[in-house]
């Protein structure tokens, strides 16, 4: 696994702007961050690179949970706004990347 990306404030702002109109693609509910949820996040990152994950439950633990998921999936946390986390992971192949950072 590689390292999570450390964004400059300019890069972070650009990614936040791109994520603004996105709807959450994964919702964390009563079961918490299960293997199925992690798989959904992984598949969504493969398809979109930039996604939102909404926490309907476990709101107090969201920072720790999403940090753990990012480490598992080699993704980067852009920002948490309210109960929504914005995650980014570039496509492994440069020619497949939709977002430059």
Where are these regions (language model features)?
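Positively charged, polar, low-complexity stretches
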Residues: 2-101
């Amino acid at each position: 696994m590689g390292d999570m990306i450390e964004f400059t404030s300019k890069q972070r702002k650009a990614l936040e702007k791109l994520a603004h109109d996105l709807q959450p693609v994964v919702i964390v509910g009563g079961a918490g961050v299960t293997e199925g949820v992690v798989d959904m996040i992984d598949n969504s990152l493969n398809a979109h690179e930039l996604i939102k994950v909404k926490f309907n439950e476990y709101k107090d633990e969201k920072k720790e949970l999403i940090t753990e998921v990012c480490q598992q999936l080699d993704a980067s946390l852009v920002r948490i706004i309210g109960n929504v986390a914005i995650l980014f992971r570039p496509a492994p192949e440069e020619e497949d990347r939709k977002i430059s950072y």
